[in-house]
Amino acid sequence: MEFMVSASFRPQNQAEILARVPQEQARIKALREQGTVEALYISSDRSHVWVVMQGESQDQVQKELESLPLYPYMEVAITPLSGI
């Protein structure tokens, strides 16, 4: 099942966020290789991301998101998608 994840970053944590970016990139790469992350889009000001993810359930997608180093700094919404 496909899900759209919309995540905003809390601006007060910029220094902490920047320090974790390399670990975040490595984890996203691993999730792409597993087929869990299909696409990732970042806003031009880097305050928001949209991720298309595959998962058996919304709970599974939530658990994968919680594995991201930047997850503690995110406000996340997960929306199930349906094909046209």
Model-derived features: positions:
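Conserved, structured core segments of small domains
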Residues: 1-84
